Amino acid sequence: MKRGFSSGDLSSEVDDVDPNSLPPAARPIQDQPTKPPVAGGPPNMPPPPAPGQPAGAAPELSLSFGAGKTPATAAPAPPRGVSAPTSPAKSRESLLQRVQSLTGAARDQGASILGAAVQSATQRAPAFSKDKYFTLLVLDDQNTDWSKYFRGRRLHGDFDIRVEQAEFRDITVVSSADTGPVVTMAAYRSGTRVARSFRPDFVLIRQPPRDGSSDYRSTILGLKYGGVPSINSLHSIYQFQDKPWVFSHLLQLQRRLGRDGFPLIEQTFFPNPRDLFQFTKFPSVLKAGHCHGGVATARLENQSALQDAAGLVSGAGNDSHCYCTIEPYIDAKFSVHIQKIGNNYKAFMRKSITGNWKTNQGSAMLEQITLTEKYKSWVDEISELFGGMEVCGLSVVVAKDGREYIISACDSTFALIGDTQEEDRRQIADLVSGRMQNVCRPSMAQTGPGKLPSRSSVSSRAESPTDEGVAPTPPLPAGPRPAPMGGPPPIPERTSPAVGSIGRLSSRSSISEVPEEPSSSGPSTVGGVRRDSQTSQSSTISSSVSRAGQRPPQTQNSVVEDAEDTMKNLRKTFAGIFGDMXEIANKKRGRTASETSSGSGPGSVPSSAGPGSGFSSSFLGKQFSFAGKGEGVISTQPTQRPSEEPPAIPTTASSAVRPESSVSVSDSRNTDTLTERAGAGYQPVTNYEQQERVNPFDKEPSKSGSAASIHTSSSSSISSSSISSRINRNGNAIQSPPPPAGPPPPPPTNVTAVGSNANSSSGYRNSFSSSLSKDKTSYGNYGSTTSVETITRMDTNTTNIGATATEAGEASGVTAITNISNSDGIVAPTTGTITTSVTTNDWRSAIGMRSASVYSAPAAVTTVLPGDTSGYDSNSIASQGEGLNNPSDLPSYTRPSYSRSESNASKHSDLDVIFGDSKTTPASYGNGKYTRAAGSISDADMIFGGPPSNYKTDRFGASKSMSMTSGGVGSGNGSGSGLGGYKIYDSIQNAAFSDFSDSGSMSSIGSHTKRWSASKEEDDELDLK
């Protein structure tokens, strides 16, 4: 198609160019100079097309190029970007003049239409509240406008999110222990640099604080000093400011997961660049300092290139701060970037198409690939570092042979890539909004009589998001942050008692989310203060659901009020009219908002709160919903037992306004009502869940020395991961004896009775199976209320087995009948037989199974090993005659630590072997923590095969003491007593070596003779990591 121009100098500009073949954004604009536009929009001047509508199908603005649509007087203009070959400057200038002169009226009409649309949208949208908002500080460059991702989001129903975006170089932070941090940000207004100050309630960090020569870690320190919560946590952000430090933590993951489970690239660290000359493996990659985006990274082909690079690095800066790392060069096929944003995962494959060995530089092909379970597990492990990270990433290089190498990890400052950047930013905004909903809470000072809600943790300023002036509020001590009349401290609403990032902070109860009436009662106000000061474990979803279910009329009224009120004075004047309609209606009925939601008076439980009653989330100032018998708890805690909660809630909550002990949290002491059990026997933990921690940087399970605080509301809460002792630490030759040469022989049949406590001497044997059926239901004679792991019994192979039944009451080696009392004092008769066989009695030639979790193979104790135990009296005929070394009594311990305590009275416990006492001392009985004692050999010798002194130094390091807890065990009460026996449990655990001491210790069965000593000689804590 050829078109002619009315202007002669442009007649040859658009030859062979079809405007309809161009994309909509590049289609040319046609001028109409001889026909002025008519006001009101004639057919040749309709409104502009809707966004995304093709230009050919759009209503005409006298600018269309469709055939038959151009008026006779219209002169087509050339397309943009196509210039005449003879005079490009002239044709471009004339084109701009024609376009500017032609589109003036169309621009005016479009502006009027756009203004009307904006005005209508503004009328429908809620107005920004100048007093009720939280300030979000976003540290990122100016390429991304984060304010649009938070526009329209509200916290607690009627609080806006005000976004302050800046780079690290543009802000300074001054933090005070009393008033919190004050951020001063430089802004440019009309070419003039103006500084304004504000207090941030939350921080989103998307820019690396340290990159090359720029180092803004002091800003992170100031924000941390002020206790500002953030994503990611300021703790993790600071930990990521040295790449070797992060890589050292990746090495710890590799040691735990294995090289195949976590294929980390081999890397060598040099704290000083002068030491680089020692490296001899090439080709390699040198990385100097802490840089991003492939900066300060070089590929070295030989020793000469290494010398040149080392010289450059040495002369570039201070030697003490210029560390280097060298890793082997991988001839990569492509690289993979794995990112995690909350619960959203993505994986991208990036392959260079320009031959650059750095795939993040030059031109590269980027493709989103399927996230494998392996990639997901890797990035999940990364997210658990440094107290947990919501946003993190991982870089993997895939070699041409298909092998994968993890080269680096990144935090929330990684660059978003691919076509899903908008989606990723919205997901980050969702994370920030959800966290701010939990940690940003208005002060209780705004709920007092005659006061309207105002910002609590943010300084009150008179400027709007679009104000022109600058608020020069100096130190900002006069803001509403300090609450009067003994309110909460200045900044507690932002942080937990221990940290400021991921602590357990409550999302306000309904009594504090809306302003109270001036006539609200005093007890209700006090209860509201108490409830608001408590912390909650609810998530964003549970708090939102609970809040929406509590007061839908209040939320609607607050939205309507914010949409209609545009001036602060009007809000003050009409607060009583357009306030909380639900609160007014409730007060007409003689109830307050808290009474309506909880079904009772302020802070108390109604008399009708029976087993079927339910309590909403505003009852205790927590986002909990007690529905029925504790089965509707919206919490991260396990559900309480149905038989215990109905009496527990009225009992603890009847103390009016301070019912903090009625709900079990990991940092509060529980009452006995919630933690008592009908039987003190072993309760298997089937619904154990990780409790939310006050300290977000502590990823270990909750640990405490108090018996009342180590139990959750459901069951015991000591996790198995807290038992962190390591057997075989230092590679002693005694640790690995050869496998047994044959089955262990049984004790001799010529058994003589031993004068000892019949109950205690037979309790140990009765706790195991009387046959070789590998029965797992009757071999545990240990009870513990803190049991998480189990000990699996595995019988050894024997020959010539013959079972012998005996009469009850005998205290001989083949007697296995006694009365063992359980935890409730009920005497349960237990009958059984002891398996005996006639073979040689030298059990040291081949013995039992050692720990399967540590040694995975049978072990044997021979007389030629240094651990010769022939001198111990447990090898005697009497001790073997008692059946103590019977083949059916040799269990296999599948725990990472040796954690068994014995109950037989004829010999001492394992403590003498573990703690290294080989002498014979007078035995005694007692309660409490048992430390080192003396006596004869026990099963520890048989299993591990070493002398007693080695168990103290080799097996458990420098451990000197041991704590033991036995549930359902009575105190020792003399010889012949039947009240102190052990109960038989399905899954057993008694004393365990861990990095802390269990409390609530109880004594084992009583015996005056040949028991371990209860003397507290060395009461040190175990350190077995």
Curated annotation (Swiss-Prot):
- Write down any Gene Ontology CC term: synaptic vesicle membrane
Further details from the record: Readthrough of the terminator UGA may occur between the codons for 581-Met and 583-Glu.
Name the source's superkingdom. Answer: Eukaryota
Feature: compositional bias, Polar residues: 651-673, 726-735, 750-759, 872-904
For the null mutant, the annotation states: Mutants show no obvious defects in brain morphology and no striking qualitative changes in behavior are observed. Quantitative differenes are seen: mutants show faster habituation of an olfactory jump response, enhanced ethanol tolerance, and significant defects in learning and memory as measured using three different paradigms.
Molecular function (GO) terms for this protein are: ATP binding
Q: Where is the composition biased (Low complexity)?
A: 454-463, 499-546, 594-626, 703-725, 760-772, 995-1007
Report biased composition (Pro residues) as residue ranges: 34-52, 472-492, 736-749
Q: Which species is this UniProt entry from?
A: Drosophila melanogaster (Fruit fly)
Print the organism lineage: Eukaryota, Metazoa, Ecdysozoa, Arthropoda, Hexapoda
Q: Which residues carry this modification: Phosphoserine?
A: S539
Per its record, how is this protein called by name? Synapsin
Q: Where is the composition biased (Basic and acidic residues)?
A: 690-702
